[in-house]
Amino acid sequence: MRNIQIALTKGRLEKHVIPLFEKIGIGCSELKDKGRKLVFKSKNTNISFILVKAVDVATYVEHGVADIGVVGKDILMEFEKDIYEMVDLGVGVCKFCVASIPTYNPKSYRKKRIATKYPHITSTYFHDKGEDVEIIKIEGSVEIAPLLGLADAIVDIVETGKTLQENGLIVFEEMCSISARMIVNKAALKTKKDEIFRIINMMEQEILSGK
């Protein structure tokens, strides 16, 4: 069997995705006690894992460094990559939301300033609504932007809403739901078709059995 390299995201999705691979018989013991390592071999299989930042997973898959990747739908929406999106894993579910301080008026005709880590998604959303907004890209915590007057509102991913609540913000609009997706390199799907579809089929069966 040909070797398969899978790119996973470090952080939020990691805790949801590793159990899925274990349930379909792909050992991930080294991922649980990884230290500073970023490349791991699954024992007794032809599969290895690489751990990278979420924004880089699709890039590694697009360029063929990884055959398969698991990444949030937010990354695929923000950064359009030449890959195949194969499976909605149904984990890491959260929502894109417009949030601000309680006095924010979403119906105001004044041009709004929106702070976000996701300028493409935000611009598309407001454009589709027919609203002209100024997008301010923020790399760190966006919750502070309305509090300091940098922006009228923010667009961000909301999982529990706890961070918003702690900063005195509330959700005004729910834009869309997102979750973890399995993506595949286009060339690998041809050259390693059997190996890749074996993983995909097992994952789909596991997801269906868990519903």
From Swiss-Prot:
- Predominant place of localization: cytoplasm
Q: In which pathway does it act?
A: Amino-acid biosynthesis; L-histidine biosynthesis; L-histidine from 5-phospho-alpha-D-ribose 1-diphosphate: step 1/9
| Group of enzyme by EC | transferase
Extract the Gene3D superfamilies matched here. Periplasmic binding protein-like II (3.40.190.10)
Q: Name one GO biological process term.
A: L-histidine biosynthetic process
Asked whether the keyword Acyltransferase is assigned, the reply is: no
PROSITE patterns for the chain: ATP_P_PHORIBOSYLTR
CDD domains per the UniProt record, alphabetical: PBP2_HisGs
Signal peptide range in chain numbering: none
Q: Where located?
A: Cytoplasm
What reaction(s) does this enzyme catalyze?
1-(5-phospho-beta-D-ribosyl)-ATP + diphosphate = 5-phospho-alpha-D-ribose 1-diphosphate + ATP
Q: Provide this UniProt record's keywords sorted from A to Z.
A: Amino-acid biosynthesis, ATP-binding, Cytoplasm, Glycosyltransferase, Histidine biosynthesis, Nucleotide-binding, Transferase
Which InterPro entries does the entry mention? ATP_PRibTrfase_cat, ATP_PRibTrfase_CS, ATP_PRibTrfase_HisG, ATP_PRibTrfase_HisG_short
Which branch of life, at top level? Bacteria
The Enzyme Commission number assigned here is 2.4.2.17
Provide any one GO MF term from the record.
ATP binding
GO CC, alphabetical: cytoplasm
Domain-related comment: Lacks the C-terminal regulatory region which is replaced by HisZ.
Q: What does this protein do?
A: Catalyzes the condensation of ATP and 5-phosphoribose 1-diphosphate to form N'-(5'-phosphoribosyl)-ATP (PR-ATP). Has a crucial role in the pathway because the rate of histidine biosynthesis seems to be controlled primarily by regulation of HisG enzymatic activity.
- Give the family from UniProt: Belongs to the ATP phosphoribosyltransferase family. Short subfamily.
Which proteins does it associate with, and in what oligomeric form? Answer: Heteromultimer composed of HisG and HisZ subunits.
What's the protein name?
A: ATP phosphoribosyltransferase
